[in-house]
Amino acid sequence: GWTLNSAGYLLGPHAIDNHRSFNEKHGIA
């Protein structure tokens, strides 16, 4: 989604890692 792209672009790799962890917690992956 646009949130992942925007967060990754604005905040950097740590944002992507955090987002990925969030998805794993909720089983979205």
From Swiss-Prot:
Cystine residue pairs: none
InterPro entries noted in UniProt: Galanin, Galanin_pre
Main location: secreted
GO biological process, one term: neuropeptide signaling pathway
Superkingdom per UniProt: Eukaryota
GO molecular function ontology, one term from the record: neuropeptide hormone activity
Protein task: Contracts smooth muscle of the gastrointestinal and genitourinary tract, regulates growth hormone release, modulates insulin release, and may be involved in the control of adrenal secretion.
Protein name, entry field: Galanin
